[in-house]
């Protein structure tokens, strides 16, 4: 009884050894406290603790992403696969420097490329007009093939509007990336480069690539349906070249707004989808045509004006960003909508109508470039 009390104290249970009230004699107590037996008990106790109860030290592993922590929040629309590793910077504001420069640089390059594209497109249209006259004459004397599959495809393509033909390439790119998500061996690469996260090691390229990335079929179908519905209106307002510059820039700008919100709130997590860029398209059309009538899919009997729809969407995304709703990236939606409103109101005058100096420089470069024969013009 006396030795059991000492062992309990040795185990660290906080129980001090006391003399037994009954059931023991002075000789038993003296024998229990003898040096040889006490040392043997200590030795045996040490061996038992080492071999029987002490756990081996765990190997230190690098910290992985924790989907249950408050610092890591994942939307329900992103893939449930583990990212390689998240290491949020101890200086989170510094992580926004590279994305900021990338956003400004990419936006400038997008609009510059669109201006040059429009210049080349106008030149090619003049040339194709004369080529078309020659082609029509050849088709008149060439026997026509009836029921040709290629002819049916060309007929379908020619019946599309300019806006629908423009967004067809965007939809095809989204479908291709969606298929890549189905390849198990590519999921780590897809998470790294096709989802945007300010806590990731790769910050800049996902700002653009995530705009074409969808993991959920419903997410992709809903976004592409909205884009297809507004394609004719937005291309009629901006033109094909300017629309592409606005769409790509909107994807990067909305992702940067998402980065800022995640860093400010500390709720890191990957995001993906074209919703930010599509919100720019929707906001631009609703701002330009506020009295247009819109309806919800599957509920065509309920209609409302485009201006009221835009106000409701902005209010919902603002509430979601403030209250921390996690199903959508409300900061990206809000950033895309505000960019669309700003561009239609001010950006078109400030950016697109001041593209002439760049076009003149490009024209001079094309005019002064060497001919194919090697001489200069």
Curated annotation (Swiss-Prot):
Gene Ontology CC terms: mitochondrial inner membrane; nucleus
Active site location: 275, 333
Ligase keyword on record: no
Annotated signal peptide: none
The record's account of how the chain is modified after translation: P-beta is proteolytically processed (beta-cleavage) in a PARL-dependent manner.
UniProt keyword Mitochondrion, yes or no: yes
GO BP of this protein: protein processing; signal peptide processing
Residue spans, topological domain Mitochondrial matrix: 53-99, 186-205, 261-270, 317-330
Entry keyword set: Hydrolase, Membrane, Mitochondrion, Mitochondrion inner membrane, Nucleus, Phosphoprotein, Protease, Serine protease, Transit peptide, Transmembrane, Transmembrane helix
Free-text function comment from the UniProt entry: Required for the control of apoptosis during postnatal growth. Essential for proteolytic processing of an antiapoptotic form of OPA1 which prevents the release of mitochondrial cytochrome c in response to intrinsic apoptotic signals. Required for the maturation of PINK1 into its 52kDa mature form after its cleavage by mitochondrial-processing peptidase (MPP). Promotes cleavage of serine/threonine-protein phosphatase PGAM5 in damaged mitochondria in response to loss of mitochondrial membrane potential.
Subunit structure: Interacts with PSEN1 and PSEN2. Binds OPA1.
Annotated protein name in UniProt: Presenilin-associated rhomboid-like protein, mitochondrial
Organism (species): Bos taurus (Bovine)
Gene (name only): PARL
